[in-house]
UniProtKB/Swiss-Prot annotation:
Tetramer of two alpha and two beta subunits. Its main location: cytoplasm. This is Phenylalanine--tRNA ligase alpha subunit. It comes from Shouchella clausii (strain KSM-K16). One of its GO terms (biological process) is phenylalanyl-tRNA aminoacylation. Coiled coil: none annotated.
């Protein structure tokens, strides 16, 4: 048996040395060390040996088995290293190629528009205010001269949270909250950007959620001409120095008198086109002189103080400025649309 084991060892080691792949190594391992291999057969036949030969042959068989196993493991490692080296040579990286830049995001167009509006009014001496999006019925309606039985309430379908709380339908409630903080002493000069909510069906020009910027200026001897001057300055800085505005009579419960504000069409320079419906003007916001009752409810003496207020839809301004025809694009999270404003 000694000669048989020695012969098996040399035979297995020679085959391992010339093995070309992992498959060859596995085949040798099964052939010589497997359950049906010759070394296993030798170990099974040890029962026929004498008591003196049994430990000697057993030790030799284990030694041969370990030597073959170690040789196969060593050869397998070399083959793996050679395969990795070959793969690296074939898949070498050209480090001279320029890297791929990381994808950079962009400011959302509505954020960019709000920021621009804020900067314009900060330059005009206004401060930035804010108020709650879940508002009380009092501040959203009554403080804005809309009592519970006022017919104008039917014009706005609202999202009520409780009987007395609702998602604000306008940023106007911040007018009352801000004036209350000043305790009847002016001047009050603030713009308030924020989200508002109405039960509108979403389409190309309507959304159940949109953004407004509210403006308020209260002081002694504030006049309608002050309102026009501020809004004309805003229009020229926002749309371009060649633009002008006009005021049309309108009605809002919280202002008296009230006006709709149009800006001259930038497509046709006021001559008339499809965009402005041949009028030369495009409606952009509502405004007016603060109603005396709103001043009184907020703690100001309407005989001593006056003021103006205005409200503009951010999405509408953005659509006009960037020639966007569908308000839903602002909220679709489509990168193809949003990345167009990367340099805005």
């Amino acid at each position: 048996m000694r000669e048989q084991l020695t012969a098996l060892k040399h035979e297995a080691l020679d085959k391992a040395e010339v093995a070309k792949s992992e498959q060859d190594i596995q085949a040798i391992r099964v052939a010589y060390l497997g359950k049906k291999g010759p070394i296993t057969e030798v170990l099974r036949g040890m029962g026929k040996l004498s008591a003196e030969e049994r430990p000697i042959i057993g030790a030799l068989a284990n030694e041969v088995r370990d030597e073959i196993k170690n040789k196969l493991d060593e050869k397998s490692k070399k083959l793996q290293e050679a395969a990795i080296k070959q793969q690296l040579e074939q898949e070498s990286i050209d480090v001279t190629l320029p890297g791929r830049p990381a994808l950079q995001g962009a400011i959302h167009p509505l954020t960019a528009v709000v920021t621009e509006i804020e900067e314009i009014f900060l330059g005009l001496g206004f401060s930035i205010g804010e108020g709650p999006e879940i508002e009380t019925d009092y501040y959203n309606f009554e403080a804005m001269n809309l009592p519970k039985d006022h017919p104008a309430r039917d014009m706005q379908d609202s999202f009520y949270v409780t009987e007395d709380l609702l998602l604000r339908t306008q940023t106007s409630p911040v007018q009352a909250r801000t004036m209350e903080k000043f305790a009847g002493k002016g001047p009050v000069k603030v713009v308030v950007p924020g989200k508002v909510f109405r039960r509108d069906d979403d389409d190309a020009t309507h959304s159940h959620q949109f953004m407004q910027v509210e403006g308020l200026y209260v002081d002694k001897k504030v006049r309608m001409s002050d309102l026009k001057g501020v809004l004309e300055t805003f229009a020229k800085q926002f749309f371009g120095q060649d633009r002008s505005i006009r005021l049309r009579p309108s009605f809002f419960p919280f202002t008296e008198p009230s006006v709709e504000v149009d800006v001259s069409c930038g497509i046709c320079s006021g001559k008339g086109c499809r965009v402005c419906k041949q009028s030369g003007w495009i409606e952009v916001l509502g405004a007016g002189m603060v109603h005396p009752r709103v001043l009184e409810m907020s703690g100001f003496d309407a005989n001593e103080y006056s003021g103006f207020a205005f409200g503009m839809g951010v999405e509408r301004l953005a659509m006009l400025k960037y020639d966007i025809d569908d308000i839903r694009q602002f909220y679709a999270n489509d990168l193809r649309f949003l990345m167009q404003f990367k340099d805005v």
